[in-house]
């Protein structure tokens, strides 16, 4: 009897977890599911324009979660992001910038954390490296680059330009 109850509880937990999993797996899917207030601004947002709105909070949660930089609660995966930032642009103190913006985001509710971090980070000396890191991971998730490919800023920029040109 106890085993059946435990099994049932486990099954329900699995189903609930599946129901809460992010349905999007690429930035493109996040853009397709963007809130109505931002539908006409996708091209602008792809140029890293910060926006304060509930729709942008949801969009940045989606994008940053898909590229692997935040978890489902908007918490920054600091070691993952820092490792890539240092590969992309080693001449900047990304750790200090990240600490500042993670601290700022920690004062926000979980639904606003990703966008708060994003907006803050765009205002730091990590801006160029962050853009490249997001773009690189977007390309990896879209299957346009492989993890075995070394980071090549020119290739990343060219592939992102192709995507942008197709959308905009």
UniProtKB/Swiss-Prot annotation:
UniProt KW keywords: Disulfide bond, Secreted, Signal, Vasoactive, Vasodilator
Domain of life: Eukaryota
SUPFAM superfamilies on file: Insect pheromone/odorant-binding proteins (SSF47565)
Tissue: Female saliva (at protein level). Female salivary gland. Not detected in female carcass without salivary glands. Not detected in male tissues.
Database matches in Gene3D superfamilies: Pheromone/general odorant binding protein domain
Binding annotation for noradrenaline: 31, 46, 135, 138
Residues bound to histamine: 118, 135, 138
Signal peptide range: 1-21
One GO biological process term: vasodilation
Cellular compartments per GO CC: extracellular space
Cysteine pairs bridged by disulfides in the record: 30-62, 43-168, 101-120
Binding positions (serotonin): 31, 59, 118, 135, 138
GO molecular-function term, one example from the UniProt record: odorant binding
Pfam families: PBP_GOBP
Compartments where located: Secreted
Family membership: Belongs to the PBP/GOBP family.
Functional summary from the UniProt entry: Modulates blood feeding of female mosquitoes on vertebrate species by binding and sequestering different mediators involved in the host response. Binds serotonin, noradrenaline, histamine and adrenaline. Inhibits histamine-, serotonin- and noradrenaline-induced smooth muscle contraction. Exhibits vasodilating activity.
Protein name in UniProt: Short form salivary protein D7R2
Organism encoding this protein: Anopheles gambiae
Encoding gene per record: D7r2
């Amino acid at each position: 009897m106890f085993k059946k109850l435990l099994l049932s509880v486990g099954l329900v937990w699995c189903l609930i977890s599946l129901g809460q999993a992010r349905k999007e797996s690429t930035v493109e899917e996040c853009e397709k599911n963007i809130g109505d207030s931002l539908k006409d601004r996708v091209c602008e947002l792809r140029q890293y324009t910060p926006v304060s709105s509930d729709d942008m909070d949801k969009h940045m949660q989606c994008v940053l979660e898909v590229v692997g930089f935040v978890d489902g609660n908007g918490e920054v995966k600091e070691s993952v992001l820092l490792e890539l930032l240092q590969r992309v642009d080693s001449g900047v103190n990304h750790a200090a910038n990240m600490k500042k913006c993670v601290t700022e985001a920690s004062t926000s509710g979980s639904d606003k954390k990703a966008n708060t971090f994003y907006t803050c980070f765009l205002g730091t000396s990590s801006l160029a490296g962050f853009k490249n890191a997001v773009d690189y991971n977007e390309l990896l998730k879209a299957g346009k680059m492989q993890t075995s490919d070394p980071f090549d800023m020119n290739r990343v920029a060219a592939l992102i330009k192709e995507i942008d040109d197709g959308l905009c």
